[in-house]
C-alpha cells in the first residue's frame, strides 16, 4: 500500500527499543508470520492469531524473514546472519540470538506484505522446478538440524530430526521400488540434507547430482 513506508517511520519513531520487527501477511490465513520457540506458547499463539484482533505490535520470539526491520544499532557485530546457512532458518537463528542477548523481537499488524513465496528464478521456472524442489528439500533439512545443534545441543538436534531422517530414508527406498522418480528425489534430497548436517558437512548443495 502507498502508506506502507509512512507506517514504518511511525512505528520506528514510537518504538526505539526494538531489535527486530517482522511484517505480517496481507492475504495469508494459514501460515504464521511470527511465533514462539516454546511449543506450548507457540500453539496457543497459533490458535488465537487468526481469531483475535491483533495489537499494533506483538512481542514474539521469532518472525519470518520475508520482510523484516532490523535495528542495526542494537547489534555490536553488524555481520548479523550466520553464513553457514545457505537457505532457510537464518531469520530464526537471528531471532534466537536476539532473545538470548536480551533483545526485543516484534510482529506488527500495521505492516502488511504480500508474500509470494518460492517465486525466485528457479521456483518460477517450470523447466527448473524439479531442481528447485531438490534445492529446497536439501537445504530445509540441513538448516533444520544445524539450527537445533547450534542453539540447543547435538543430541537434542538428533532427537528432533530422528523421525524425519528414518522416514525420508524409508520413503526413498519405497518410491525407488515404485519407479516414482519425483517422490524418490523428494525424500532422497531430504535424507541427504539431514545426513550432511548430522555429520558436520557444509551446506554446499547447489544443484549437483549425488547419484
Regions found by a protein language model. Name each.
Residues 59-64, 68, 84-88, 133, ...:
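Aromatic-acidic/polar surface patches that form glycan- and anion
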Residues 7-10, 73, 77, 97, ...:
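Residue-level signal for well-ordered alpha-helical scaffold segments within enzymatic catalytic domains
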Residues 61-67, 76-107, 111-114:
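Donor nucleotide-sugar recognition loop
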Amino acid at each position: 500500500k502507498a502508506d506502507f513506508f509512512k507506517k514504518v517511520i511511525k512505528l520506528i519513531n514510537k518504538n526505539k527499543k526494538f531489535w527486530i520487527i517482522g511484517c505480517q501477511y496481507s492475504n495469508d490465513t494459514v501460515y504464521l508470520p511470527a511465533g514462539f520457540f516454546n511449543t506450548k506458547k507457540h500453539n496457543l499463539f497459533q490458535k488465537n492469531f487468526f481469531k483475535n484482533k491483533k495489537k499494533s505490535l506483538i512481542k514474539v520470539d521469532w518472525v519470518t524473514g520475508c520482510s523484516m526491520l532490523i535495528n542495526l544499532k542494537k547489534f555490536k557485530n553488524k555481520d548479523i546472519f550466520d553464513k553457514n546457512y545457505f537457505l532457510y532458518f537464518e531469520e530464526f537463528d537471528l531471532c534466537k540470538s536476539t532473545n538470548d542477548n536480551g533483545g526485543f523481537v516484534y510482529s506488527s499488524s500495521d505492516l502488511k506484505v504480500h508474500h509470494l513465496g518460492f517465486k525466485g528464478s528457479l521456483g518460477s521456472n517450470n523447466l527448473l522446478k524439479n531442481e528447485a524442489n531438490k534445492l529446497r528439500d536439501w537445504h530445509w533439512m540441513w538448516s533444520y538440524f544445524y539450527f537445533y545443534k547450534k542453539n540447543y545441543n547435538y543430541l537434542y538436534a538428533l532427537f528432533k530430526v530422528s523421525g524425519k531422517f528414518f522416514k525420508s530414508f524409508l520413503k526413498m527406498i519405497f518410491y525407488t521400488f515404485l519407479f516414482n522418480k519425483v517422490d524418490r528425489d523428494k525424500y532422497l534430497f531430504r535424507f541427504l540434507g539431514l545426513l550432511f548436517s548430522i555429520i558436520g558437512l557444509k551446506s554446499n548443495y547447489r544443484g549437483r547430482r549425488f547419484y
